[in-house]
Amino acid sequence: MPILNRAAEFQQEVSEWRRHLHAHPELLYDVEYTAAFVAEKLKEFGIDEIVTGIGRTGIVGVIRGRGESSRAIGLRADMDALPLDEIPGRPWASTIPGKMHACGHDGHTAMLLGAAKYLAETRNFNGTVAVIFQPAEEGGRGALAMVEDGMMEQFGIREIYGMHNMPGMELGTFAIRKGGIMAAPDKFSITVRGRGSHAAEPHKAVDPIVIGAQIVGGLQLIAARNANPLRSVVVSVTQFHAGTTHNIIPEHASISGTVRSLDEGVRTLAEQRIAQIAEGIAGANDAVAEVEYERACPVTVNHPEETTHAARAAIDVVGAANVDTDVDASMAGEDFAFMLQSRPGAYIMIGNGDTAGLHNPGYDFNDEAIAFGVSYWVRLAEQRLTD
């Protein structure tokens, strides 16, 4: 089954929805305008049930098929934007300063709406499709909020599927893998407390800058010497702040960064070693290191059987030559991981073509991907809910 003719027919309409959402970006849980737009469209499609306020501002639409099966699957799209100023020029560019859809969640929402429209028209499946529109993917754990609100139980969801666009991947292609596909994106901060002095009298100081520099160097040993080289981990220091002027050794310095891992054991190792290295180096130099470590999201782990189902649906749409079933994992993070911890499922990438990268002020979702995404969602739902 290639691209659905019906999906191709209303691609322009879905593109118009996408561009409308792009012009009205909202952040985290504050997606009231977007959620209202989604709810209105679902109502127009005549779906069976629309439930709002799940995970604060999330929406679930229920589409029942022709048969009597109680089986239900969930298809998820994220709705929130990013705190960026968009490079102007497009007629549908953001109308809200400091906010833009730089990760393609406008496209994700529009594609799932397109699939909902098609599924509500045809209902060529036996069971229930729950179309899930999630807030706060960008750092707000919106997926966890929806899970903790009892979404899976309320709608009887047995399997859950997600999709994300990928700049640099050709249009009309998909990519997926079994196991970890997205990393756990953790954060750490270190405060080094020493003793300040005049810069001309360094012997009277316990210099947090020199000590902090040693800590930064020591952290590189985690990936280079502590972790199994066959289990990927990234430890990146991204901020180092200290001092206010040129002739004073400050009393403290702050260091922060991120850890990315695809293995829970390596993740725990990195957390432990950051504390040991920072506290050990500081203590050896008569200073104190205070370490905070925040686990943001788990590793996004695709379940084997559901990954096979997702790949099969993609192959039916674009052909086997255009589906990479063993793509390299990404060290970016994704809170869909919480849904995959709650139910078996899979997360797939869809090609966005040669566009600016994600989280870039020049990025835009490629509307030419819409028909592929809508067709994938429809094919997946119909395959998983056959008699």
Identify the role of each PLM range:
Residues 74-76, 188, 347-352:
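Non-cysteine beta-strand/loop elements that form the S-adenosyl-L-methionine
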Residues 21, 61, 75, 105, ...:
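Divalent metal-coordination and catalytic microenvironments
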Residues 1-101, 106, 110-125:
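Acidic/His- and Gly-rich active-site-bordering loop/insert found
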Residues 63, 192-194, 259-261:
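Short beta-strand-to-loop capping motifs
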Residues 48, 157-158, 344:
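Conserved acidic residues
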Residues 26, 78-80, 136, 166, ...:
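Active-site beta-loop-alpha junctions enriched in small/polar residues
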Residues 60, 81-100, 106-107, 112, ...:
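Histidine/acidic-residue-rich, glycine-tolerant segments that coordinate divalent metal ions
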Residues 210-387:
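Metal-dependent amide/peptide-bond hydrolase catalytic core
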